[in-house]
Curated annotation (Swiss-Prot):
Organism from which the protein derives: Streptococcus agalactiae serotype III (strain NEM316)
SMART domains given in the database record: RL11
Lineage: Bacteria, Bacillati, Bacillota, Bacilli, Lactobacillales
Keyword Transmembrane attached: no
Family: Belongs to the universal ribosomal protein uL11 family.
Pfam families in alphabetical order: Ribosomal_L11, Ribosomal_L11_N
Gene3D superfamilies with a match to the protein in the record: Ribosomal protein L11, C-terminal domain, Ribosomal protein L11/L12, N-terminal domain
Self-association state and partner proteins as the record states: Part of the ribosomal stalk of the 50S ribosomal subunit. Interacts with L10 and the large rRNA to form the base of the stalk. L10 forms an elongated spine to which L12 dimers bind in a sequential fashion forming a multimeric L10(L12)X complex.
Alphabetized PANTHER family for the sequence: 60S RIBOSOMAL PROTEIN L12, LARGE RIBOSOMAL SUBUNIT PROTEIN UL11M
Single GO molecular function: large ribosomal subunit rRNA binding
Identification of the protein by name: Large ribosomal subunit protein uL11
Domain of life the protein comes from: Bacteria
Posttranslational mods: One or more lysine residues are methylated.
GO annotation, cellular component aspect: cytosolic large ribosomal subunit
Biological role stated in the UniProt entry: Forms part of the ribosomal stalk which helps the ribosome interact with GTP-bound translation factors.
Length: 141
């Protein structure tokens, strides 16, 4: 019989830098997970993506064992990296802080495709463009 999932824990952790310190430690401690076991495994799996923030969904089972799924970095993080800025605009409709090209948007959409609820690349690109506009970025051809 399959193990029964007791709890789902969702976190966003910098790749290769999971530590038992907050926010990771307390979230996993409440779920009863072996914190060191998780941090070692997560850091090993994400070592090649250094510098990115990686969303992770941890399934905790009744016997306190766990497994986790890493997702692609958030679109906002990928857009900031592509545009070379630290953060988006505080007033996106008034102040534009950066410009991204359609080619960069397409590259980000291809990266995010497994995690997006999009039927094709074109609709995924529209989602990424919407995120860019809401951050105060201008999308150019």
């Amino acid at each position: 019989m399959a193990k029964k999932v007791e709890k789902l824990v969702k976190l966003q952790i910098p790749a290769g830098k999971a530590t038992p310190a907050p926010p990771v430690g307390p979230a996993l401690g409440q779920a009863g997970i072996n914190i060191m076991g998780f941090t070692k495994e997560f850091n090993a799996r994400t070592a090649d993506q250094a510098g990115m923030i990686i969303p992770v969904v941890i399934s905790v089972y009744e016997d306190k064992s766990f497994d986790f799924i890493t997702k692609t970095p958030p679109a906002a993080v990928l857009l900031k990296k592509a545009a070379g800025v630290e953060k988006g605009s505080g007033e996106p409709n008034k102040t534009k802080v950066a410009t991204v090209t359609r080619a960069q948007v397409q590259e980000i959409a291809e990266t995010k495709m497994p995690d997006l609820n999009a039927a094709n690349l074109e609709s995924a690109m529209r989602m990424i463009e919407g995120t860019a506009r809401s951050m105060g970025f201008t999308v150019t051809d």
